[in-house]
Amino acid sequence: RTMAIPALVGTPLPLDESVDGKLGIVDGSDGTIYVDPDEETLAAMQKRRTEEEEKKKLLLTLKGKENITLDGQKILLYANIGNIKDLAAVMQNDAGGIGLFRSEFIYLEQDHYPTEEEQFRIYKQAAETMAGKRVIIRTLDIGADKQCDYFEMEKEENPALGCRAIRICLTRPEIFKTQLRALFRASAYGKIAIMYPMITSVGEVRQIKAIVEEVKASLAEQGIEYGNPEQGIMIETPAAVMMSE
């Protein structure tokens, strides 16, 4: 989807030789594949593709305009990204900012723990590219469906609610501090905000705040420039909902 390539998952396909070399149509909008379509189906699909292209052209005419509802309420329309390559589409489509930068993909795309400098360059590029627009970066959310070999995590019966995201960061503080140092440094170059995932207690928030203060003190002592990014939590667990009440 990110690359604008139609794709299907889990769709049964005829895999015998009878389909070899035949024309196929992949309809990613409703999860259908047509093998050797007749003229009527082919014409209908071509018409739909033309209509989709016209819709995209129409949306591009809205670039630079504010998002306002009929009753005058302004809406902030942000984009989600997984890596720095996605920034081109964000800029092309005139997003108001980045609502979620999934920083775990920086880890998943490498065979080693990303260094502070490696992360700093990526976050800095995102901040500078967005040119004053808000960039909300989620701290490492590894675990569950996002496994990383070099993390050497133990197998769990229920990894979705196990040691993942902020729990890993708090049990492996050096990894967390490295990321926070990179984030605070990059925040001096743009409007970066930091979001902490899978929070379930006030105690975790207090632990995070203590580590953040350590990081800021360390940067100041070393004479390294850093900003003052917004910070918040991702409300995604029942405990977080009840706690926020």
Question: Over which residues does each language-model region extend?
Answer:
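Acidic, glycine-rich flexible loop/linker segments
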Residues: 1-92
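Conserved alpha/beta-domain cores
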Residues: 56-245
